[in-house]
């Protein structure tokens, strides 16, 4: 009788183990892009759960970008579980020494030709609003000390 109980317990444990799926990690979609005009943009979205959702967020950003700017080069894209450097500062909305476009769930840092980077930042922020998001702003870097 105790072997029957043990067998039933092992069967139930086996069912539990095979149906249990661990929670997918929270990942941050990151894309780095370079334009032919000399702008380098780091794009960070809000964290999403799971690799599939993260890859979809990257695709949603990259496909329209490649259509709008076929000469732009996607330097890299990643789904990061931990952020460092520029990406961490963007995700946490910390001050940066570069121009930043901030909108709902999106942050972009932009580095480029000094005489044109401010106009680019303001233009992108305005375009984001025209595309349907409620607000977007260009955050200027702090003045040199």
Per-region residue spans from a language model:
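N-terminal Sec-pathway targeting helices
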Residues: 1-12
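Mitochondrial intermembrane space
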Residues: 14-145
């Amino acid at each position: 009788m105790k072997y029957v109980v043990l067998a039933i317990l092992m069967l139930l444990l086996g069912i539990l183990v095979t149906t249990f799926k661990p929670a997918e990690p929270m990942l941050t979609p990151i894309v780095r892009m370079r334009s032919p005009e000399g702008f380098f943009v780091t794009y960070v979205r809000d964290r999403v759960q799971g690799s599939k959702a993260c890859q979809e967020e990257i695709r949603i950003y990259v496909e329209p970008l490649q259509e709008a700017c076929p000469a732009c080069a996607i330097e890299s894209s990643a789904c990061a579980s931990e952020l460092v450097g520029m990406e961490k500062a963007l995700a946490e909305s910390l001050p940066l020494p570069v121009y930043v476009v901030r909108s709902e769930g999106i942050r972009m840092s932009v580095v480029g030709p000094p005489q044109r980077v401010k106009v680019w930042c303001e233009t992108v922020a305005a375009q984001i609003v025209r595309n349907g998001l409620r607000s977007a702003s260009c955050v200027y870097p702090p003045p040199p000390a």
